[in-house]
Swiss-Prot record:
Cellular localisation: Secreted
GO CC, alphabetical: extracellular region
Source organism: Lithobates palustris
Membrane-crossing residue ranges in chain numbering: none
Keywords: Amidation, Amphibian defense peptide, Antibiotic, Antimicrobial, Cleavage on pair of basic residues, Secreted, Signal
A GO BP annotation: defense response to bacterium
Residues that bear Isoleucine amide: 60
Domain of life: Eukaryota
Annotated protein name in UniProt: Temporin-1PLa
């Protein structure tokens, strides 16, 4: 029973480290994308186009 607790604790510890490393890598990727002007333009377009579509559909529907 003691060995199973040790192995579970080891798995938990390794999983926590792995999760931490993945989060750091993801944060670094997000910062890199924010720094790229082309990516920023794409994000603005993604936010802008649905808004324009809703406005136009509202005007056409009335």
């Amino acid at each position: 029973m003691f060995t199973s607790k040790k192995s579970l604790l080891l798995l938990f510890f390794l999983g926590t480290i792995n999760l931490s490393l993945c989060e750091e890598e993801r944060d670094a990727d997000e910062e890199e994308r924010r720094d790229d002007p082309d990516e920023m333009n794409v994000e603005v377009e993604k936010r802008f186009l649905p808004l324009v579509g809703k406005i136009l559909s509202g005007l056409i529907g009335k």
